[in-house]
Structure formats: C-alpha cells, structure tokens
UniProtKB/Swiss-Prot annotation:
Its EC number is 5.3.2.5. GO terms for biological process: carbon fixation; L-methionine salvage from methylthioadenosine. Keywords: Amino-acid biosynthesis, Isomerase, Magnesium, Metal-binding, Methionine biosynthesis. Mg(2+) binds at K174, D176, E177. It comes from Bacillus anthracis. Its cofactor is Mg(2+). Catalyzes the enolization of 2,3-diketo-5-methylthiopentyl-1-phosphate (DK-MTP-1-P) into 2-hydroxy-3-keto-5-methylthiopentenyl-1-phosphate (HK-MTPenyl-1-P). The modification N6-carboxylysine is found at K174. GO terms for molecular function: 2,3-diketo-5-methylthiopentyl-1-phosphate enolase activity; magnesium ion binding; ribulose-bisphosphate carboxylase activity. This is 2,3-diketo-5-methylthiopentyl-1-phosphate enolase. Belongs to the RuBisCO large chain family. Type IV subfamily. InterPro entries: Diketo-Methiopentyl-P_enolase, RuBisCO, RuBisCO_lsu_C, RuBisCO_lsu_C_sf, RuBisCO_lsu_fd_N, RuBisCO_lsu_N_sf.
Length: 414
C-alpha cells in the first residue's frame, strides 16, 4: 500500500453495498470507469480508487427509524492512491470524505496510512515519556486540574487558584478552553505570574506542577502568540484544535520555535463525531489524527462522567494514542468531564498507568478546597496502585470526597 485506506460505515437504501462502494471509490477519484475507452482506462488505472472489502452488517431498526427508510448497513474499505493527493491532512480528508460527508448516511470510521505517508507527519514532540521526564513522574498516572470561574477575574485570583491546586499535588493545571486573550488576565501575564507561583510551591513543598496556557487568536496570529507564550516561559500550550483545524495543530507542532508540548482540547469536535450514522469517528478524530498531527495530550469525554462517550469508543481513542508505532511517540490519553476520586480505580483499570486523570469540580468542589481535592485524588491514585479499596483508606480528604460524590468503584477489581 502506498496511499491510504478509508474504512466507512454506510447505509444504503438500494440494498447493494458492492455497487455503493464502487460508486464511492470512483466518485472520489476518477469519476467514472466503465464508459471510458480502454486506452484512457489504462492511463487512469493508477488513479482509480479500489474497493478492498465489503461486509454486510445486521439490520438495525433504530437506524431505519432515524433515517425513515429501510437501509442495508455495511462496512467498506477503499484504497486511494498516493498519486491523487498531496501528503497533508486537508488533502487527505477532502479525498476520503470531502463531498461524501454531505451524504448524511456515511461515517468515516478509520484511515490507514501507508508508511510512506506517515513520514509527512510530526507526531508528538514530547510524547508520554517526554512529559514524564519533564515532571520526573514515572510510576503513576498524572493528575490534572482546571482553572474554574476565571472569566471576569484578575491575575490575583488566578494565582490563588493555581497555588492551591499545586499544593494539592496536581501535576498539570490547565486554562479553561473558554479563557481567551483579555485585559484582566493577558496571556504573558498569566504565564509569568503562574511560573512565580509554581516555583514558590516547588521550593516550599518539593512538588513540580506544569501550567497549560490556552493559546488563542486569529489563525494567522497563532504562531506568533504561541512563540510569545514560549518566550514568557510557557510549560504547555492548550489548543482548541477543532475550532481551527488539524493542519493548524500540525503547523504549531512542526515549528522549532515552539518547543513545548501541545494539549489538544476536543471543543467543537462533537459537531464532527457525535452521530453514530455520519461524520467522523471519535477514535479517528480524537485519537489517530491528533497524534499524527502532533498532540502530546488528547482530551476526550470519559465513559464515566457528565459528558460520557461509550466505553468502547473511549478505549479505542486511547488505543490509537498509545499503541506502538515506529513513526510516532505516544500521546497521553486524558479522559475528562465529571471525574471525581471515586472514578480513579475505573480509570486506571481501563486506561492503565499512562493516563492523565483530569478533574475540575472534583477538585474545586471539595470541602477543603482545591488543596483537599488534589490530595484526595492523589490518595485515590496511590491506593488504587496498591490494590487497596478506596473505602478502606484512612484519609480525611479522600473520605470527604467519597461522602460527597460517592464511591462507584467499591467493587472494582484491578
């Protein structure tokens, strides 16, 4: 294979999956085939999309009801020659799913890149091992928390929140994705003030915390804003990838003047991936493509919290982020939304140690504040790694958290 193989879920009311697959393969490449003169067929053969696989799936009554017609469901695989497109994500996505995305009844499940094509993508700069080296934490999941309620607040408020989270043992604190450039907490001021706080906590408590600052602005200003952040001392850049595009992420990741990890936020991605019938699958969008384009971290809805993905989907995202690939470093999985300490055993059981446990209200809503919330999570992580049930741990901060949010992991076996 020298090009790319696209895997689709299709719904066909003509009940002829083979014909539908061939129509897609031709429609996204040379347009027609059977009516072409033999000589022209020979000339265009190397550009023709090739149907590799057609598999019929069981009928699904809910799908028929939603589409208001009876359809045949199937999985098809089509190979697109590398000759047809330039080796960049805009060209790849337009080739494999451009006008086809308007069909409304086709979902792009996966893209399989040839080794030759993979060479054109950077992958994560740091990856899991690089992030762990920055923090000198190698034997447990990382803990991340989020600034809450920062809109309309000043730098002093930010510093207080940051200090409490760091003292609580949080490894990474990230901006809220809706915190943009503003007069009260400008980008460089946040970074400089944040570093002062984190250095003070490190000197006093010996705990290192990294700050992920939200890089925002117009598309053609992003690189300059990212470089300003780096010059001010940014540890990590948070980036709302899908508000801009995967190619913009790749551009930031490839820039040698932006030598810091990039954390990809999934904002807007639901517009592409939420439907089971059409769009782009979450594992492809939030897993494989983010990793290839250069994200060191990928945030996505966890299977447990308030904005839940199905467990199978969430684990598939993580698989794409962390599976061995000689071309790319591994990216951190960050299952998010509605996470509290009682979910920690689930997260470690399902995602392993190479995961970032990300909490907002589960830290800030603790009765002992963010310090208590962070400590509750750290205790839950340590207990889980020691195979100790959370309800047996004698720790006031963890006990308080379990009293408030419950302990759904009571029967979890690791």
């Amino acid at each position: 294979m020298s090009g790319i193989i696209a895997t689709y879920l299709i719904h066909d009311d003509s009940h002829n999956l083979e014909k539908k697959a061939e129509q897609i393969a031709l429609g996204l490449t040379i347009g027609s085939w059977t009516h072409l003169p033999h000589l022209l067929q020979e000339q265009l053969k190397q550009h023709k999309g090739n149907v590799l696989h057609v598999e019929e799936l069981a009928e699904h009554e809910h799908t028929n009801s939603y589409l208001r017609k009876k359809v045949k469901r199937g999985i098809i695989k089509i190979e697109y020659p590398l000759l047809n497109f330039s080796p960049d994500l805009p060209a790849i996505l337009t080739t494999t799913f451009g006008k086809l995305s308007l069909d409304g009844e086709v979902k792009l499940i996966d893209l399989t890149f040839s080794d030759e094509l993979k060479k054109h993508f950077p992958g994560p700069k740091f990856g899991i091992d690089g992030i762990r080296n920055l923090l000198q934490v190698h034997d447990r999941p990382l803990l991340m928390s989020i600034f809450k309620g920062m809109i309309g607040r000043n730098i002093g408020y930010l510093k207080t929140q940051l200090r409490d989270q760091a003292i609580g043992g949080v490894d990474i604190v990230k901006d809220d994705e809706i915190l943009f450039e503003n007069a009260l907490t400008p980008l460089t001021n946040r970074i400089v003030s944040g570093k002062e706080v984190l250095q003070s906590v490190y000197e006093t408590y010996g705990h290192k915390t990294l700050y992920a600052v939200n890089v925002t602005g117009r598309t053609f200003d992003l690189k300059e804003n990212a470089k300003r952040a780096v010059q001010a001392g940014a540890d990590i850049l948070l980036f709302n990838v899908f508000a801009y595009g995967l190619d913009v992420l790749q551009s930031l990741a490839e820039d040698d003047e932006i030598p810091v990890p990039i954390m990809a936020h999934p904002a807007v991605s639901g517009a592409y991936s939420a439907s089971k019938l059409y769009g782009i699958s979450s594992p492809l969008l939030l897993g494989k493509l983010l990793r290839y384009a250069g994200a060191d971290f990928s945030l996505f809805p966890s299977p447990y919290g308030s904005v839940a993905l199905e467990k199978e989907e969430a684990l598939a995202i993580s698989k794409y982020l962390t599976e061995d690939d000689v071309f790319f470093k591994k990216s951190f999985s960050v299952p998010s939304a509605g996470i509290h300490p009682g979910f920690v055993p689930f997260i470690i059981r399902d995602f392993g140690k190479d995961v970032v446990i990300n909490a907002g209200g589960g830290i800030h809503g603790h009765p002992n504040g963010a310090q208590g919330g962070g400590k509750a999570f750290r205790t839950a992580i340590d207990a889980t790694l020691q195979n100790k049930p959370l309800h047996e741990v004698d720790d006031i901060n963890l006990h308080s958290a379990l009293q408030i949010w419950g302990n759904p992991s009571h029967e979890v076996k690791l």
